[in-house]
A protein has these predicted regions:
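Nuclease-adjacent, charged terminal/linker segments that flank catalytic cores
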Residues: 1-79
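Residues at alpha-helix caps and immediate loop-helix transition turns in enzyme cores, especially N-
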Residues: 16-17, 159, 187
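Short, well-structured alpha-helical interface segments that form or flank functional binding sites
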Residues: 32, 36, 115, 158, ...
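Surface-exposed alpha-helical segments enriched in charged/polar residues
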Residues: 39, 43, 161-168
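Solvent-exposed, charged helical/coil patches
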Residues: 67-115
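Ordered hydrophobic segments in well-structured contexts
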Residues: 89-91, 101-103, 119-123, 144-146, ...
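Conserved catalytic cores of phosphodiester-cleaving nucleases, focusing on short active-site segments
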Residues: 118-134, 138-159, 163
Length: 228
C-alpha cells in the first residue's frame, strides 16, 4: 500500500465520515498528512471525554456552522472567515467546559502582528464564531493547541529553527506540537534543548509514536478541562 493510501485509510478509520471525492490518494501528501494528524486530535478528544455518554459531543460543521457528514478539508492556507473556501471544521464539547473548534490550515495573528499559517489549530468556539462574524484573524492567545505538521522524510535544522521562531511569535494557551512523518537526531536535539514538544515518525504503522502523540494531546485537553 502506498503512503498516501495508508494515510487515507487511517483518516477514514478514525473519523468514520464520508470524505470529499476530490480528497483521495492523488491528493498531495502534505494535505493528507495534515488531515491524518487532524484525525488524531479528534481521537484524542474522544478519548478524553467528547462523547455523549460522558456528557460531551463531537460534530463536524461546514463554513456556515451547519452540521455535516461530508468532510472537506482545506488544502491551502486560508482565513477562518473565508466564504470562498468550503471546508469542514470539528466542534469538540466536554461536559461543562467551553466548546472548542479544530481547524486545518488557518491564519493566526501573533505578537508581531503578522498573519502566520497554523497547520492545525484548536481554539475556543466562541472566539472562532466571533472571528467569522467580524471577519478577523484569530489571535494566538485564543488557541488552546497548535500543531506544525511536516510530511518530510529527511528533516533539516531549518525546520526546527522555523518552528522555534513560530512558537515565539504565536503563543498559545496550552500546547504547541511539532509533528513529522520523518525524523532527525539534530532536529530532535534542537527542539528538546529548547523545551519544545516534538513527535517524529508519526505515521500509520508506527503505533508507539502515534499513541505517544495522542496521549500528549489528551494531556493538553485534560489540562484545558482542569483550568475551566
Amino acid at each position: 500500500m502506498s503512503i498516501n493510501a495508508s494515510l487515507l485509510q487511517s483518516i477514514r478509520l478514525r473519523l468514520g465520515r464520508a470524505m470529499s471525492p476530490s480528497f483521495g490518494t492523488a491528493t498531495q501528501g502534505t494535505d493528507l498528512y495534515e488531515a491524518y494528524i487532524f484525525s488524531l486530535v479528534i481521537r484524542a478528544a474522544l478519548n478524553e471525554g467528547a462523547l455523549p455518554e460522558q456528557g460531551g459531543a463531537l460534530t463536524f460543521c461546514d463554513r456556515d456552522g451547519q452540521i455535516t457528514t461530508n468532510l472537506l478539508f482545506r488544502r491551502s492556507p486560508g482565513q477562518i472567515y473565508a466564504a470562498t473556501q468550503a471546508c469542514t471544521h470539528a466542534v469538540i464539547e466536554f461536559k461543562g467546559k467551553p466548546s472548542l473548534e479544530v481547524h486545518i490550515g488557518i491564519k493566526v495573528m501573533g505578537r508581531l502582528k503578522v498573519a502566520r499559517e497554523c497547520d492545525i489549530a484548536v481554539l475556543y468556539r466562541d472566539r472562532a464564531i466571533a472571528c467569522r462574524t467580524q471577519r478577523r484573524i484569530p489571535k494566538a492567545s485564543e488557541l488552546i493547541i497548535a500543531i506544525e505538521c511536516k510530511h518530510i522524510e529527511a528533516l533539516d535544522l531549518d525546520a526546527a529553527s522555523e518552528f522555534i521562531g513560530l512558537t515565539s511569535d504565536l503563543r498559545v494557551k496550552e500546547s504547541w506540537f511539532f509533528v513529522s512523518s520523518g525524523s532527525s537526531e539534530g532536529v530532535a536535539r534542537m527542539l528538546a534543548n529548547d523545551r519544545k514538544e516534538w513527535h517524529h515518525n508519526v505515521m500509520p504503522g508506527e503505533p508507539n509514536n502515534v499513541n505517544r502523540l495522542m496521549y500528549s494531546l489528551q494531556s493538553s485537553f485534560k489540562n484545558f478541562k482542569a483550568k475551566h
